[in-house]
Amino acid sequence: PFYFGLYGGSAMAGFLESDPDAAPFFQALGYQPTARHLVYQCDLNDHHVPVSVRLMEIRRKMELRAVAQPDPLTWWWSTRYGRLESLRFLLGPKAGGLAAAGVTVVALDHYLSKWQSQSIGLTDLAVPKAEQRQGFGQALILGVMRRLRDELFTQVECHAPDGNEAAKGLLESCGFKQVDAGSVFQRPSD
């Protein structure tokens, strides 16, 4: 869909810094950057899963579940993901109960010829406030990446707002590397 951006990827990042003509063009027209998003990727062929006691404890108590789509299905979800293959992964207690974290996985098959890799995008990562800073987000992402590698995907992409240190730290702790950044431009009101 159009709203996944001009460059492809798992989310809208704005105009990428790797496109050197974009920023000068928009600034010459009076637009100013208003937000910046970082683009992270992880090569699953080279990925080494971090090991820690906390992650082992989470894996012992929690399980990864896949759900096809949200319930109830909303107009917003349908317009954003309806034409793409997507799946929601939840990390929840093996004994049952509410999920401690969730992320949506979006197939990026449209970019196979350009990127030369079987890629997947991660978006809509959510960890309830009460569950944050306990390793659930990291355990979820690492579990999803392990599953994707088993399904023969070779690259995972995720975006994070610049300035969101928690998201940046989480992605980097899972083996992601920043590969680009994008700026959203807006014309100042007169």
What residues fall within each predicted segment?
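Conserved acetyl-CoA-binding loop-helix of GNAT-fold acetyltransferases
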Residues: 127, 133-150, 168-173
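Active-site pocket scaffolds in enzymes
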Residues: 121-124, 145-148, 157-161, 169-172, ...
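Conserved acyl-CoA
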Residues: 1-5, 139-155, 177
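Active-site proximal loops enriched in glycine and acidic residues that flank catalytic Cys/His/Asp
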Residues: 93, 103-107, 124-126, 160-162, ...
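Conserved active-site alpha-helix within GNAT-family acetyltransferase domains
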Residues: 2-35, 138, 162-180
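Short hydrophobic/aromatic beta-strand or adjacent loop that forms the aromatic wall/cage
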Residues: 35-39, 86, 179-184
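Acyltransferase donor/substrate-recognition loop-hinge adjacent to the catalytic core
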Residues: 24-72
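A conserved beta-strand-loop-helix scaffold within acyl/acetyltransferase catalytic domains
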Residues: 73-126
